[in-house]
């Protein structure tokens, strides 16, 4: 068994991170952009249906209360913060994001958004990626008033940035309804090329705004989500159209990142192969301690994949035995498997290096 896939391997990796990586990396701010996979609660402050503010969301969070995270507990940004010895970043819209809390960083992510501005229009009031960038500029002005412009520029340049986009551009746009506007406008391969082109503009904007170490996650195994199984699967097989979309999108994202890094002249952007990370435990759930990788812990209908996770939904008693928390989102345990690969994974998962290597390189420059 591959040690990185086993419980022992996970513990060894965690020991390495806590005892070796965290002490060597100077405290740095952490900024998060993207969708529901990384939203720490911004949508709780918006009038939108894309919210996770009801029980049983947060059932395993330290406070045992919903926080706006689409998880039973911690999400990917929380676990990255934990691994590098920093507190979780607050949502940018939180009234508590003031004073010294600003220096930790901020989470700008908003459930439902995508690369394109017409993605997630059914959710109406969400923070589209262009607005997230505006908030990042606003954040820098707020911090400049606190510590001065030079120190602010240094804080941003030395920060870690995470961006997670793309899934909703397929699930909540191209494949949202039969004969959607985008599917009539583009054949799938052409749509992917368009998405990658638009994503390139976003990454270059991040660099322009001062980001110098950016982790970019590709789309996960979208067709294997319980919501997709409930709609499209007869025997538990993943929905082929979305799997094909991911197979087209992710390699082109890696190529884009290599191209942008070449333009800049340094490896600012690091690609995470979220699809492969997902497929490892979805294809072999028992190897990771899951009893199922198809049925969501919280939900209703086939695979618990219909509708929202609510107080009256089916709820599994042990979330650690399930890969999916709700119809679309991983459990905290699955998120920990993903972050473990982000931090210590081989070139199969991370390009051009894993996050631990990147951060150790960064620490030598600070």
Swiss-Prot record:
Gene3D superfamilies per the UniProt record, alphabetical = SGNH hydrolase
Q: Which UniProt keyword terms apply here? A: Glycoprotein, Hydrolase, Lipid degradation, Lipid metabolism, Secreted, Signal
User: Which tissues does the record link to its expression?
Assistant: Mostly expressed in flowers, reproductive stems and rosette leaves, and, to a lower extent, in roots.
What are the record's GO terms for cellular component? extracellular region
Query: What sort of enzyme, by top EC class, is this?
Result: hydrolase
Family (UniProt): Belongs to the 'GDSL' lipolytic enzyme family.
* UniProt protein name: GDSL esterase/lipase LTL1
Tell me what organism the protein belongs to: Arabidopsis thaliana (Mouse-ear cress)
Q: Which gene encodes it?
A: LTL1
